[in-house]
């Protein structure tokens, strides 16, 4: 279990690292971290809408890529390697025009390097 002090440190570092990037432009914020998971939230406003008035799929993809890649970087056991996403598949179940969307990244398998 990650203690509160370490949790706050990891979340602050993750959010600070994203300042001035697409992540901050989309108002994505990391909100929770545990031993093997990372959570981020994105507040849906009209600036994130597609012309039909619902959340743009690209914004959803950016949220998923952000939380997945950030989790990989945080939990990597190799400090000399930079991890990045390789493939992304998004299925939209329902549209949303306002509120908050939440993404949680959890590994399927933690090996020697991850």
Regions found by a protein language model. Name each.
Residues 1-114:
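Terminal targeting signals and extreme-terminal segments of soluble enzymes
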């Amino acid at each position: 279990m990650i203690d509160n002090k370490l949790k706050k440190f990891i979340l602050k570092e993750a959010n600070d690292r994203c300042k001035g990037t697409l992540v901050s432009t989309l108002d994505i914020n990391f909100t929770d971290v545990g031993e093997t998971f990372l959570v981020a939230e994105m507040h849906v406003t009209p600036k994130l809408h597609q012309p039909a008035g619902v959340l743009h799929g690209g914004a959803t993809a950016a949220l998923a890529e952000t939380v997945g890649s950030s989790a990989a970087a945080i939990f990597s056991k190799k400090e000399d390697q930079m991890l990045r996403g390789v493939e992304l598949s998004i299925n939209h179940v329902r549209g949303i025009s306002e509120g908050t969307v939440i993404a949680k990244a959890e590994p399927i398998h933690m090996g020697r390097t991850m």
